[in-house]
C-alpha cells in the first residue's frame, strides 16, 4: 500500500527500491502493481470489485468539443481525443505536451476507433526511419498499421471495477475509455482504480 500511495501522490510511473547502502535494487512499475493486484483478486473485498464505473468517485469526465480546425480535438480537463483524419504526428505531440500516456483516436461522431500511446512513442523512437511516417499518415491509418495497437480499450459505465482490473491486466494498459452510445464520455486510469481501492 505504501508503493500505491507513493505512485498516487505524484506523477510517478516507477518507484525505485533501494537497499541499506542506498543502491537501487529493483524498480516497481504501475504495470507490476496491476499484476500483483490481479494475482490477489480473490482476496480483494467483493464490494469493491462490484462497484460500477458510473459509481466511481474518481473518473475523468465527459468530453467537450474544442474548436481547433487543424486537429478537430475533443477535450476537457482530463481527456483529449484526436480525430482520425489528423496527422499521426499530432497525436504524438499531444501525448508529449500534455504528459498523458495515451490519446484516443475518434471518428467525426466521436466514436473511438483506436488509441495512440506512449508505447507507440517508444517503438518509433527506436526506429528513426518511421518518424517520417508520422507526418504522412493520418491517425486512422497509423493505428490500423501498427502492431502495437490494443483492441480492447473501452468499458461501459455499468462495467465493474473487476472488469476494469481484468482489462488493465490482460492488455497491459493504464487507461480505459468509458463509452456510452458509441462515444467517449470519460476515462478510468490505473491511478483512478488504486485511489478508489484505497478510499474504500
Regions from the PLM with identified roles:
Residues 1-20, 24, 76-80, 86-108, ...:
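Helix-loop-beta junctions that constitute the ligand-sensing/allosteric loops
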Residues 30-80, 92-93, 117-169, 190-200:
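Tandem CBS (Bateman) regulatory domains
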Amino acid at each position: 500500500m505504501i508503493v500505491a500511495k507513493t505512485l498516487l501522490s505524484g506523477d510517478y510511473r516507477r518507484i525505485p527500491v533501494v537497499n541499506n547502502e542506498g543502491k537501487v535494487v529493483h524498480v516497481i512499475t504501475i504495470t507490476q502493481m496491476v499484476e500483483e493486484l490481479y494475482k490477489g483478486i480473490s482476496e480483494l473485498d467483493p464490494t469493491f470489485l462490484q462497484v460500477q464505473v458510473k459509481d466511481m468517485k474518481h473518473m475523468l469526465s465527459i468530453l467537450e468539443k474544442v474548436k481547433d480546425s487543424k486537429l478537430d480535438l475533443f477535450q476537457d480537463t482530463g481527456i483529449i481525443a484526436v480525430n482520425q483524419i489528423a496527422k499521426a504526428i499530432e497525436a504524438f505531440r499531444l501525448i508529449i505536451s500534455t504528459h498523458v500516456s495515451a490519446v484516443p483516436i475518434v471518428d467525426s461522431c466521436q466514436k473511438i476507433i483506436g488509441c495512440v500511446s506512449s508505447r507507440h512513442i517508444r517503438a518509433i523512437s527506436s526506429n528513426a526511419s518511421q518518424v517520417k511516417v508520422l507526418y504522412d499518415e493520418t491517425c486512422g491509418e497509423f493505428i490500423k498499421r501498427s502492431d502495437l495497437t490494443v483492441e480492447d480499450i473501452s468499458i461501459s459505465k455499468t462495467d465493474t471495477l473487476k472488469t476494469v482490473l481484468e482489462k488493465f491486466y490482460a492488455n497491459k494498459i493504464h487507461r480505459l475509455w468509458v463509452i456510452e452510445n458509441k462515444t467517449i464520455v470519460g476515462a478510468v486510469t490505473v491511478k483512478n482504480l488504486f485511489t478508489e481501492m484505497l478510499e474504500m
